[in-house]
A protein has these predicted regions:
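Feature recognizes metal-dependent phosphohydrolase scaffolds
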Residues: 1-161
Length: 161
């Protein structure tokens, strides 16, 4: 079979930098098991600047919402724990934190909030953290920062994003 070239690569200044995926991630790849996203596949897809279908984002939010609405307001944490704070839309910083801090499958994480605003990838941060939280309910703790309120997000760039 003859190899087919990608017509979208012809106009790229840096030919070795692949373009983002043209289509949103397939539902079956995101949710291979009912109500449990494949967080690793999502991480890979978002790292390539891939998109999700609006219906999949809503499904992810609803599953996440059902988990966090039952969590206590005050949490007691046993060490060891990896603490991550103030990501502010820096998705690639989150990836580095996960690399340095340890695999969420066997590392307890405490995220201190301020996931959104300032950076350009706030939505990607929320999507990935929600999918990790859904998979590891008892070892991923997400606190709400001051940027996770309507007043702050209306003044910064998350509303536009």
């Amino acid at each position: 079979m003859e190899e087919v070239s990608d017509p979208f690569l012809d106009d790229r200044v840096m030919k070795n930098v692949l373009p983002p995926p043209r289509f949103p991630m397939e539902h079956q790849k995101l949710f291979p098991k009912k109500n449990q996203p494949d967080w690793k596949a999502l991480k890979t897809h978002l790292t390539k600047e891939g998109r999700l279908a609006k219906s999949d984002v809503i499904e992810l939010i609803n599953i996440f919402k059902d988990i966090i609405k039952n969590e206590p307001t005050i949490v007691k944490i046993q060490d060891p724990v990896t603490i991550v704070g103030d990501l502010h839309g820096q998705f690639y910083d989150l990836l580095k934190c996960l690399e340095v801090g340890g695999n969420p499958e066997n590392t307890k994480y405490l995220f201190l909030g301020d996931y959104v605003d300032r950076g350009l990838f706030s939505l990607e941060i929320l999507l990935l953290l929600m999918s990790i939280k859904i998979n590891f309910k008892n070892t991923i703790i997400m606190l709400r920062g001051n940027h996770e309120c309507r007043q702050m997000t209306s003044n910064f760039n998350f509303k536009k994003e």
